[in-house]
Amino acid sequence: MPSYSRCVESLPRSALALTALFESIKGKCTGLSVADSTPIAVCDNLRIRRHKVFDGIAERGKTSTGWFFGFKLHVIINHLGEILSFRLTPGNTDDRKPLPELIKDLSGCLYADKGYLSASLKQQLKTMGINLITNIKHEFRTNKKTLYF
């Protein structure tokens, strides 16, 4: 069994093999899909300056829980939990940016969180036959005024 440092050193070389594995186990589009992203930190924030394995590839990113240094894994799954498409991007990539590339072979409804909310993206996906369903951010809600007596 290889040591941790040897395993970390081999990660960049194994990216192609992992991509081929994921491509071979992809599921079929069922009309109901879910999009999300998750951070993949490659080192602790205190060690960013000393990190050399993914130097020039990994970037600093921010999530709802704080800052990290590494990558973002963007995944779209169907309602059965099968992976339909995925991309690995630097940590500073906006969630909305890789979405048009991820949905090339999809149709139907795509559920996503607030990170994917954009009027222009929703319109772009609608022209491609995909209905993007997201939560409503507070800025986009209509102000409902009520009278209190």
Stretch-by-stretch model annotation:
Residues M1-F149:
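Short alpha-helical elements
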